[in-house]
């Protein structure tokens, strides 16, 4: 199989779909890899490293898309990339379609088979290709939130860890999944007072066992969220409904009642965000202020630590890339129902129910397009 690795073109996105080490594994199995020149130069992987691993270096993205059977990326394709996709081609990347009807319709028109990292599952019901970036985003959320609380960034001038004689700041984490747990761990580590809200009692019990008295846990109700949001210095939105748009847990009225200079970090912004006042931002302009509250809503947070993120993501995606290449996409999905859960669009139709439901588009089950 011919596998294409383009350079990411989203603003301030430096991650890459395959590292030289991954390319070496793929080519050792008899596949051809085409990498656009400079695809990962920004994170220390130059073209010579890819050549040494067995890749062919292409001069342009057009060349990669025109010749590859399988495109391996990181972020959702931008409009000019969607225009390069063609019928019969397979795209393997993060898509986050439930909040992006324009992208979804573009992928439908392309005729390509589109497999989303974020909806691939495992036997435990977890999301193995989302987890590495959720870990990164969760840990980053406290880091960037603490920075945004500084006065020069528009924040209230609060040091989350406090100092002797001065109380530590209050961090509220909405969602106790992978990103929320990592956010809580980081916030605890710097000495903040941490509260996690989740709708799963078993998950709250696990967090209580993991962190003990260092974290307060609350069952998710509107009243609990409202009270905790208003009282917090930093609120981290880490809510996930796999493949679907994020629920708006924090209303405009709640934001209005927060203290001036408080900070919201919306990890869920890829799926539409979980604050009513959220809208996507970039690393170039990461924040804005609404109702006196600083909002950080960067859609590709892990791109800021692109080398770490690329290595972590590659560890998770490589086995699936190998399966797609060795078996062909159709047989790989038939053999692996967990990989099949990643199929979001095929030959002009949406094959992931939550995406179709959120966007009001026709739905066809993945099993029917596979003929099983």
Residue ranges and their predicted role:
Residues 6-45, 152-240, 287:
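Glycine-rich phosphate/diphosphate-binding loop of Rossmann-like nucleotide-binding domains
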Residues 118-159, 269, 274-372:
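Adenosine-phosphate binding glycine-rich loop
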């Amino acid at each position: 199989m011919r596998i294409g690795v383009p350079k990411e073109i989203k603003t301030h996105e430096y991650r890459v779909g395959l590292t030289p080490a991954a390319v070496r594994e793929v080519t050792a199995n008899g596949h051809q890899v085409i990498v656009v020149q400079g695809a990962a130069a920004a994170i220390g992987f130059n073209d010579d490293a890819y050549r040494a691993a067995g890749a062919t270096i292409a001069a342009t993205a057009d060349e990669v898309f025109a010749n590859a059977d399988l495109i391996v990326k990181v972020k959702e394709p931008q409009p000019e990339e969607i225009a390069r996709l063609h019928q019969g081609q397979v795209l393997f990347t993060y898509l986050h379609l439930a909040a992006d009807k324009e992208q979804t319709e573009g992928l439908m028109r392309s005729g390509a088979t589109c497999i989303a990292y974020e909806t691939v599952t495992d036997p435990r019901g977890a999301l193995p290709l989302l987890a590495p970036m959720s870990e990164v985003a969760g840990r980053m959320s406290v880091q960037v939130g603490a920075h945004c609380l500084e006065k020069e960034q528009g924040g209230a001038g609060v040091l989350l860890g406090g100092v002797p004689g001065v109380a530590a700041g209050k961090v509220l984490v909405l969602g106790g999944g992978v990103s929320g747990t990592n956010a809580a761990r980081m916030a605890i580590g710097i000495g903040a007072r941490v509260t996690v809200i989740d709708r799963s009692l078993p998950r709250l019990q696990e967090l209580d066992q993991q962190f003990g008295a260092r974290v307060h846990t609350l069952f998710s109700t509107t009243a609990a969220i409202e009270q905790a949001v208003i009282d917090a210095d930093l609120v981290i939105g880490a809510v996930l409904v796999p493949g679907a748009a994020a629920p708006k847990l924090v209303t405009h009225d709640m934001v209005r009642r927060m203290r001036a200079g408080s900070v919201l970090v919306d990890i869920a912004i890829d799926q539409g965000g979980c604050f009513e006042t959220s809208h996507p931002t970039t690393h170039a302009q990461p924040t804005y202020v609404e109702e006196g509250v600083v909002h950080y809503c960067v859609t590709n947070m892990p791109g800021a630590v692109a080398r770490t993120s690329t290595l972590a993501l590659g560890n998770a995606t490589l086995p699936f890339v190998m399966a797609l290449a060795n078996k062909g996409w159709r047989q790989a999905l038939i053999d692996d129902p967990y990989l099949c859960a990643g199929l979001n669009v095929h030959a002009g139709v949406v094959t992931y129910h939550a995406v179709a439901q959120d966007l009001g588009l026709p739905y066809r089950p993945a099993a029917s397009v596979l003929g099983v």
